[in-house]
């Protein structure tokens, strides 16, 4: 399985930007899985054991209960026209640059900060853009 899995609702122009800068990228319904897969019922079980980062626009996935030791979920709360830019910026952030740094987290990306849940932590954490 690839390292970066993008939800089917990521626009084509954002995927184009990401594919130019990031290796090991697939999009649900295009390169992997099927269109119409439900996030919780069908996508998340496929991520178990994958060590993948799942990128989504679905705010419903920004919940502590979705933290898992073998994958990461990143929810983008940014303008759709700027998605590609924010994916690249996130992957260059010093706290989330590597796969190991991202694992076990559910992260919300916004223009002002990164907010995240981490497995076995009971409080939400925040970090600023550098």
Regions found by a protein language model. Name each.
Residues 1-4, 41-52, 129-130:
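Short, mixed-charge, low-aromatic patches
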Residues 2-17, 21-22, 27-30, 62-81, ...:
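Polar low-complexity intrinsically disordered regions
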Residues 7, 39-40, 58:
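Acidic side chains
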Residues 26-41, 45-49:
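Basic nucleic-acid-binding interfaces
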Residues 46-69:
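Acidic, metal-binding active-site segment of PIN/NYN-like and related structure-specific nucleases
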